[in-house]
UniProtKB/Swiss-Prot annotation:
Its EC number is 2.4.2.17. Belongs to the ATP phosphoribosyltransferase family. Short subfamily. Catalyzes the condensation of ATP and 5-phosphoribose 1-diphosphate to form N'-(5'-phosphoribosyl)-ATP (PR-ATP). Has a crucial role in the pathway because the rate of histidine biosynthesis seems to be controlled primarily by regulation of HisG enzymatic activity. Heteromultimer composed of HisG and HisZ subunits. It is an enzyme of class 2 (transferase). HAMAP family: HisG_Short. The lineage of its organism: Bacteria, Pseudomonadati, Pseudomonadota, Betaproteobacteria, Burkholderiales. GO terms for cellular component: cytoplasm. This is ATP phosphoribosyltransferase. GO terms for biological process: L-histidine biosynthetic process. It comes from Paracidovorax citrulli (strain AAC00-1). Lacks the C-terminal regulatory region which is replaced by HisZ. The gene is hisG. One of its GO terms (molecular function) is ATP binding. PROSITE patterns: ATP_P_PHORIBOSYLTR. The keyword Glycoprotein does not apply.
Amino acid sequence: MTTPGDVITLALSKGRIFDETLPLLAAAGIEVLEDPEKSRKLILPTNRPEVRVVLVRATDVPTYVQYGGADLGVTGKDTLIEHGGQGLYQPLDLQIAKCRVSVAVRQDFDYASAVKQGARLNVATKYTTIAREFFAAKGVHVDMIKLYGSMELAPLTGLADAIVDLVSTGSTLRANHLVEVERIMDISSHLVVNQAALKLKREPLRRIIDAFAQATAAGAPK
C-alpha cells in the first residue's frame, strides 16, 4: 500500500511542455492516465500508484517544487531564470519545448538607430530579469513595463518601443507586423527537483532522473 510519504509528485504545465514530457515519462515506465485537455482535474493519476502529476501554471512550477508542493517538475529555462532557482536541484536540460527569447519591435521602428543614439526605450515583457540583464550588458537604458500576456499589443498601441518575449516560429510576430531584431538566448525545458525530497525519496527520484537522462541522450520521440 502506498502512503502519502511515498508518493512522488511531478509538476507540469499544460500544453507543449506536458506533451513533450510524455515520452520521457514513458521511458521511466510512467503513463498519465487522463488527458489534461479533457479532464477538469488538477491532479492526474498515472499507471504507477506512487506517482502523480499536478497541473500548475508554467510560471508556478519552480515555486511548487521549491516549497515541496511537488517533488520534481519540468520548466523552461526562462522561467527558471526569472524564479532564481533557489532551493532547486537542476540535474537535466531535457532539450524539449525549444524556443528563444528575443527582442521585437514594430516593422517601422528603427531599433538599431535608437540603440546607437542612446535612446531610452520602453520595453514590455514578463521576463524582466532576462531583459534587464541583456540591455544592461549592451549599455542600453530601458524602462521596464511588466505584462503577462498579449505582448504583441504593446508596440502596436504605443505602450512600448520593444518587447522581450518567447519566439518559436515567429508567425505571431509577423501576423502583428512586428519584427525580431535581437535574439537574447535559446530556451529549452529543464528537470528541477526539490533538494529535500531528493534526500528523503532518493531512490525513486533517482530512477526517474536516470530514465529521463537516458531518454534525453537517446533523443526521446516527440
